[in-house]
From Swiss-Prot:
UniProt KW DNA damage keyword: no
Protein known as: Phosphoribosylformylglycinamidine cyclo-ligase
GO biological process: 'de novo' IMP biosynthetic process; adenine biosynthetic process
Classification via SUPFAM superfamilies: PurM C-terminal domain-like, PurM N-terminal domain-like
Pfam family, one: AIRS
Organism: Anaeromyxobacter sp. (strain K)
Domain of life, per lineage: Bacteria
Compartment(s) of residence: Cytoplasm
Entry EC no(s): 6.3.3.1
Top EC class for this record: ligase
This protein's UniProt keywords: ATP-binding, Cytoplasm, Ligase, Nucleotide-binding, Purine biosynthesis
Pathway where it operates: Purine metabolism; IMP biosynthesis via de novo pathway; 5-amino-1-(5-phospho-D-ribosyl)imidazole from N(2)-formyl-N(1)-(5-phospho-D-ribosyl)glycinamide: step 2/2
Reactions the enzyme catalyzes: 2-formamido-N(1)-(5-O-phospho-beta-D-ribosyl)acetamidine + ATP = 5-amino-1-(5-phospho-beta-D-ribosyl)imidazole + ADP + phosphate + H(+)
Family in the record: Belongs to the AIR synthase family.
Length: 345
């Protein structure tokens, strides 16, 4: 009896069918700089160097983490791709880079073209929101490697910034103002803790009055906000001195990454409203306050540091983009050594 690749668990025909299903989603994301079509060995992108004096390429890679477990349980797969793009492009945008193109890696134990197409539909939507092109990716069918119906995602984004316009935090000074920009919810961090706190007690279809009648699945799968275009628009109007994308490690772990040594950011938690989902996690899981702040974004997905004289202009620019933002603290002199961030009551 002859043995085929399909007998071993890899269905080439299903993979080809997936490629056909995702092309209509990926094609609208392509920018004029993209050369060739979808499905080649490598994605080609002709950088328009005339737009820059000293072009610097910026790259970022990330995943979605155990938020995917919620998607599996809810059988919703069309938004985690947005999360994937957000986690990558937000990281490169905070240094001032315009996201140019994106590639994804989708791995599963048993390929379903329909499920994979839903995932890539979300990735394409994330690319649309970020203004970058989905120029390639990899689909891996790995029999026996994942539970049935499960998959993992990884993304890779490349952008470009003019060297004189890199935002690296070196100009941050004592007295500068810290502005927090609203998150859409948990984003894509802390889901192992959130799932333990909530899903060990409630089903995904449980509706909390505090969530406005939304189900837990709705709240937990709310896509990560993509700030890339907002960051670039703000930089056109205000000389922002530093940005921080608030991901794993929360405010205390991420704000110092963009501050000079010998400084500290002091944030006052009463200055911004905290979305209800964080209160639910804290209460239902009896999670200590410090653990909440070092795990979750706590309602601020992006932080900007500006000079006091630019505070009003920054708020006006963010309002014009439809973003909620608050002055949440200031930069102070710190002790010797690395920068720190403290959230005070």
């Amino acid at each position: 009896m002859s043995l085929t690749y399909r007998d071993a668990g890899v269905d080439i025909d299903e993979g080809d069918r997936l490629v056909d299903l995702i092309k209509p989603h990926a094609r609208p994301t392509l920018r004029p700089e993209v050369l060739g079509g979808i499905g080649g060995f490598g994605g080609l992108f002709a950088l328009d160097v005339k737009k820059y004096r000293e072009p610097v390429l910026v790259s970022g890679t990330d995943g979605v983490g155990t938020k995917l477990k919620v998607a599996f349980a809810a059988d919703r797969h069309d938004t985690v791709g947005i999360d994937l793009v957000a986690m990558c492009v937000n990281d490169i945008a905070v240094v001032g880079a315009e996201p140019l193109f994106f590639l994804d890696y989708y791995a599963t134990g048993k390929l379903s073209a329909e499920q994979g197409a839903q995932v890539v539909k979300g990735i394409a939507e994330g690319c649309r929101q970020a203004g970058c092109a989905l120029i390639g990716g990899e689909t891996a069918e790995l029999p026996g490697f994942y539970e049935r119906g499960e998959y993992d995602l990884a993304g890779f984004a490349v952008g470009c910034v003019d060297r004189p316009r890199i935002v690296d935090g070196t100009r941050v000074a004592r007295g500068d103002v810290v502005i927090g920009i609203a998150s859409s919810g948990l984003h894509s961090n802390g889901f192992s803790l959130a799932r333990k706190a909530l899903l060990d007690r409630y089903p995904l279809d449980h509706r909390f009055e505090a969530l406005g009648g939304r189900t837990l699945a709705d709240a937990l799968l709310e896509p990560t906000r993509i700030y890339a275009k907002d960051v670039l628009a703000l930089l056109e109007q205000v000389p922002v001195r530093a940005f921080a994308h608030i991901t794993g490690g929360g405010l205390p772990g991420n704000v110092p990454r963009t501050l000079p040594d010998g400084t500290r950011a002091v944030l006052e938690e009463q200055r911004w409203p905290r979305p209800v989902i964080f209160d639910l996690v804290e209460r239902e899981g009896q999670v200590p306050r410090d653990e909440m702040y070092r795990t979750f974004n706590m309602g601020l997905g992006l932080v900007a540091v500006v000079a006091p004289g630019d505070e009003a202009a920054a708020h006006a620019a963010l309002r014009a983009r439809g973003l909620e933002a608050w002055t949440v603290g200031a930069i102070e002199a710190g002790g010797p050594g690395e920068a720190t961030c403290e959230v005070v009551r």
